[in-house]
Amino acid sequence: MNKEQKKNYISEMETQFQNNEAVMVTHYQGLTMSQLDELRAQMREHGIKFTITKNRITKIALEKTKCKELSNLFTGATAVAFSNDAIISARILSKFAKTNESLKLLGGIMGNEVLDQAAVQNVANLPTLDEARANLVGILATPASKLVSILLARSEKMSSLSPENS
């Protein structure tokens, strides 16, 4: 990689680290190309960019970003997932890591919060915004449906007691 390419790479990585709400760092040592392609395809379906990094140059790019605390994770065969939805990216990586032990989740950033490996797993178990909304609607609808059932049962009982039905 010549000097100009390195400058472009650093600039692109700085932009990715600054403009994405979620950054997940992984080690992929031992994954085959077909496994990497499969993971990339899953990520791409959700608008997540998954890229293999050049560690030394990436560390230079990290120095000027909110993600500089992740610098120590960039050793060995490292790849990064950039997205605006930490839950989806953590879920995909976590699920893939369960079936492909060569993929290791190292940590990441969600907003301005640094995540360690355990925190990434916790994020993967959180409901997405749509799932949380559906749960909330279900919780709010339950009392109303119970009230309707009680009122209907009461009206049926009242109508069966009326003299017209005798």
Curated annotation (Swiss-Prot):
Q: What does this protein do?
A: Forms part of the ribosomal stalk, playing a central role in the interaction of the ribosome with GTP-bound translation factors.
Q: Can you state the subunit structure given in the record?
A: Part of the ribosomal stalk of the 50S ribosomal subunit. The N-terminus interacts with L11 and the large rRNA to form the base of the stalk. The C-terminus forms an elongated spine to which L12 dimers bind in a sequential fashion forming a multimeric L10(L12)X complex.
* InterPro entries documented for this protein: Ribosomal_uL10, Ribosomal_uL10-like_sf, Ribosomal_uL10_bac, Ribosomal_uL10_bac_type
Q: Which gene encodes it?
A: rplJ
Name the source organism.
Pelagibacter ubique (strain HTCC1062)
Q: Is RNA-binding among this UniProt entry's keywords?
A: yes
What family does this belong to? Belongs to the universal ribosomal protein uL10 family.
A cellular component annotation (GO) from this entry? ribonucleoprotein complex
Record protein name field: Large ribosomal subunit protein uL10
Which keywords annotate this record?
Answer: Ribonucleoprotein, Ribosomal protein, RNA-binding, rRNA-binding
Under Gene Ontology molecular function, one entry of this record is: large ribosomal subunit rRNA binding
User: Which GO annotations describe the biological process of this protein?
Assistant: translation
